[in-house]
């Protein structure tokens, strides 16, 4: 679909939604294009988006689409309702500094291994929201050359972990054809080859869809690296992987992290771990809390100015709440709901930005060819596939699809601009910050949190020896070598799951049922 046509559809959809008053029923958000932002790619007739260039730190005129009325999800829910809708097409002459000035806290939650089309593609295909999602015409060839199309998944569990390492990801990309997902999955021994072409629906991920309806959905947030977890998480924390393409420690390189820069500037910060403290593999040993501490700090209004929160990572027989196959998406929804509601109920809500994103695509199909960016290492100029990303808060645009190009370095770019930090790398200055997600109209009038649907989960089986070689096995081994042994990992995982479910129930967004 050409960009001009997509813009026309978005405008028409927004008008229709306004006439029908759907937003008042809490049934989602529409999208109307604003031409003002950086990183807009062009689209072709088959629904694939073309290359897009990255710019410097984004200004307040960053591009967005949407403009429908934000609403609550209704039913069994918690939180305030009735927030004012954003005018996603409204121009602004405010720059990034002015937009970020009222922000006092930034919380970053990074989940695992899902692509944008896999998570949110059905917003376009099944619900008609005018975002860069699925059209239903997307296909990949199988090993015999037969077309395998996109289709709705029927279960919240994908048992077999699709390949997503450096080589596999580049084969899936195939110089922008994005046609290697099924063949790579098959070559890896997948029992159901078409699973990587499957997409989730609102019924399977109601929390994520409610947040996407009512806050800033970033439809062009790319993984920083076309490769696996560690390099992408390094870019979130360090704005570089030091040239690392694999899941291996880089502590010997002595690279500074965003936490170091914040410490230097006197900005309070903390890393909240669930079971596997990722920061250990690049040498950070201080300023580490547990997920239970996050809930306590949010409730008390004592969160640091900047924090990164990790879920229970699936590894070493632990089935986490991180969305990494074979983890159950329902547990991930409970985790996201609990983190969101902890902030929604916190006295810090009005001046906090919550960023929810995923480390990389996890081998799941996405139709948009990733663009390039600026990097000191030529092989790392190529971005990875799109990942789900939502920016949330009282000052954030409501129901808007943000078309500015982001990647994980956008977090460091935002913190660097907000607190006048020394940039970690040159890439920080060449990457858009998140100011285009903020609504100038809400700077002096932060909006109340939107209610979430109740997430009902069965009490999980946290450990499964049959899954010992699944998930973050390299991280589990690295943490064991650094003194966080297998027993400690399992104790931490059990405590973290318990904390999330306990707080989720206390906050009114999770209900746990026991098996008969």
Report each predicted region and the residues it spans.
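N-terminal secretory signal peptides
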Residues: 1-14, 21-27
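Ser/Thr-rich, Pro/Gly/Ala-heavy low-complexity intrinsically disordered linkers and tails
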Residues: 27-88, 93
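A broadly tuned "polar low-complexity/structure-edge" signature
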Residues: 18, 26-36, 170-171, 180
């Amino acid at each position: 679909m050409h960009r001009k046509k997509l813009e026309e559809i978005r405008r028409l959809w927004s008008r229709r939604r306004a006439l029908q008053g759907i937003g008042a029923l809490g049934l989602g958000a529409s999208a109307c294009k604003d031409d003002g932002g950086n990183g807009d790619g062009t689209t072709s007739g088959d629904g694939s988006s073309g290359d897009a260039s990255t710019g410097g730190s984004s200004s307040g005129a960053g591009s967005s689409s949407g403009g429908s009325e934000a609403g609550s999800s209704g039913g069994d829910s918690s939180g305030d309702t009735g927030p004012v809708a954003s005018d996603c097409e409204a121009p602004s002459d405010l720059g990034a500094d002015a937009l970020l000035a009222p922000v006092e806290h930034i919380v970053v939650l990074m989940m695992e291994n899902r692509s944008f089309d896999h998570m949110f593609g059905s917003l376009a295909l099944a619900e008609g929201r005018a975002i860069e999602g699925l059209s239903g015409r997307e296909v990949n060839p199988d090993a015999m050359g037969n077309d395998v199309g996109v289709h709705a998944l029927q279960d919240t569990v994908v048992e077999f972990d699709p390949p997503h390492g450096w080589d596999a990801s580049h084969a899936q990309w195939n110089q922008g054809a994005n046609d290697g997902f099924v063949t790579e999955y098959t070559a890896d021994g997948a029992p159901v080859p078409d699973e990587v072409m499957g997409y989730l629906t609102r019924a399977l991920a109601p929390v994520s869809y409610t947040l996407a309806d009512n806050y800033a959905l970033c439809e062009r947030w790319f993984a920083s690296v076309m490769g696996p977890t560690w390099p992408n998480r390094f870019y979130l924390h360090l704005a570089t992987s030091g040239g690392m393409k694999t899941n291996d420690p880089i502590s010997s390189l002595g690279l500074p992290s965003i936490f170091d820069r914040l410490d230097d500037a006197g900005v309070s910060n903390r890393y909240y771990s669930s079971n596997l403290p990722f920061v250990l593999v690049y040498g950070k040993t201080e300023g580490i809390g547990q997920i239970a501490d996050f809930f306590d700090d949010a409730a008390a209004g004592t969160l640091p100015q900047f924090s990164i929160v990790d879920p229970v990572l699936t590894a070493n027989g632990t089935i986490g709440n991180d969305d990494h196959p074979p983890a159950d998406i329902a547990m991930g929804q409970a985790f996201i709901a609990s983190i969101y509601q902890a902030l929604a109920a916190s006295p810090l809500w009005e001046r906090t930005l919550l960023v929810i994103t995923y480390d990389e695509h996890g081998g799941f199909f996405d139709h948009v060819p990733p663009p390039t960016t600026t990097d000191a290492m030529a092989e790392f100029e190529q971005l990875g596939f799109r990942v789900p990303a939502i920016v949330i808060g009282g000052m954030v645009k409501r129901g808007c699809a943000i078309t500015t190009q982001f990647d994980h370095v956008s977090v460091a770019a935002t913190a660097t601009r907000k607190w006048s930090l020394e940039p970690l790398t040159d890439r920080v200055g060449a990457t858009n910050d998140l100011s285009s997600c903020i609504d100038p109209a809400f700077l002096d009038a932060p909006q109340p949190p939107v209610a979430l649907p109740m997430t009902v989960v069965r009490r999980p089986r946290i450990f499964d020896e049959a899954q010992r070689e699944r998930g973050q096995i390299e991280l589990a081994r690295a943490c064991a070598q650094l003194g966080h042994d297998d027993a400690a990992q399992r104790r931490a995982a059990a405590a973290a799951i318990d904390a999330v479910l306990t707080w989720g129930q206390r906050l009114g967004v999770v209900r746990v049922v026991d098996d008969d």
